[in-house]
Every structure is written in C-alpha cells, then in structure tokens.
A protein has these predicted regions:
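Positively charged, small/polar-rich N-terminal and surface patches that mediate targeting and assembly
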Residues: 1-115
Length: 115
C-alpha cells in the first residue's frame, strides 16, 4: 500500500475502561482498522484528561486510575477514512460509552513498510 501527499488523520478519543464485552474499545477500533486495510493506526494513553462528562481522569502515583484517556490515531486517504467512520460509530454504540471523533488534513511525507 502506498500513501503520500494529502491524507486524513482521524483521531478517536475514548476511555481506557470502555469495553465491548472483555475487549477495550480502542482494541476493537484497531482490529477493525486492520480488517479494513487502513494504512496505519496507533493507540496513545494519556496521563490526564476529561471529556463531555467533565470528570477528570488522571494517573497519579497515589491513585492509579483504571480509566485514563485513550486516543487512537489513524491515517489514510479521505475516502477510506470516510468509509471507516461509521464502523467507529457502531463500536461506540455497542459499547454504550461516549467518545469523540475528529479529522484533519495531513501531509504524509514518508510511509514505507519494513524492508
């Protein structure tokens, strides 16, 4: 797969404790992205954040939170991202949890598999 020039960065904000059954929402998203042959995806774990509920989630040594902020970043062409957004929305519906989905244009400068 080749990816260069103008592409879309899709960000999905969720919580570490958000699951569908025993699988974390972020893992459901990553697996779905791989099944749809998305160019790439990364899960980032935040140290502090809040969302629509305004509840602050934090990682402190004294009180280790089990619900830290999670951001899934996905990059691919505009068409593939637009086709993938309903998949993410369905995952959120199944989890019965809230979240946030954003997109922005990015310029891919380098994207090559291992040799």
């Amino acid at each position: 797969m080749e990816l260069s020039g103008t592409s879309i960065l899709l960000r999905v904000f969720t919580g570490e404790a958000d699951h569908i059954g025993h699988m974390p929402v972020y893992e459901c998203i990553i697996k779905a992205a791989r099944e749809k042959n998305i160019a790439g995806a990364t899960v980032l774990r935040g140290i502090m954040g809040f969302g629509a509920s305004s509840v602050i989630h934090t990682a402190r040594l004294i009180e280790i939170s089990g619900d830290l902020p999670i951001v899934v970043e996905i990059v691919d062409t505009e068409n593939k991202i637009e086709e993938f957004i309903p998949v993410i929305q369905q995952i959120f519906e199944q989890s019965k949890k809230g979240g946030l989905i954003t997109t922005e244009k990015v310029n891919v400068l380098f994207y090559h598999p291992d040799k």
